[in-house]
Amino acid sequence: MLAYTFPSFNFYVNGFFSFLFLFLFLFPSLLRFYVILCRPLQVATYPLNRCQQYSSLAIFTASGFWLLVLVPRAKGPSTRRHCYRQLAPTHHRPFFSIFGWAVSGIRPLPEIFTWICASPFFLHSLTPPTFSHFSVYQEEKKEKRRTPKNTEQEGNRMCIWMSG
């Protein structure tokens, strides 16, 4: 309803969802890959191999490319003012007609659809498992450092056992 009353409403909603997608999805994933690929200690302790890392990076890049490049191009003339008052102008964007859009005012659907489809990958890519794995590894290392073999104590025990 708001889309028909305010023609620029869709533009702001679309921009909001694009910004939300960038802020919640692409930026953390790129930051994660920077941390993983540029810190050798975490690369050594990270449970995924390089093939899995690069494949998930390709998924992030492809979904971001689809959102930022293909979606605006596929909308085409529908972003003009006179098209906001038309009902279901899917003839000039056949790619999105498969989603069965009934109202032209529902513009952020591609962004929502992309974010929902990509959210499992995003949630899987969050770093707590990595950092917990890393912290467990660090704690094991510290425990090994704290409990070195004390040859003096073992020698004293042997002497007591031999003399007793």
From Swiss-Prot:
Keywords in alphabetical order: Membrane, Transmembrane, Transmembrane helix
Membrane topology: Multi-pass membrane protein
Transmembrane intervals: 11-31, 51-71
An example Gene Ontology CC term for this record: membrane
Major location category of this protein: membrane
Localization of this protein: Membrane
Domain of life: Eukaryota
Designated name of the protein: Uncharacterized protein YFL015C
Organism of this sequence: Saccharomyces cerevisiae (strain ATCC 204508 / S288c)
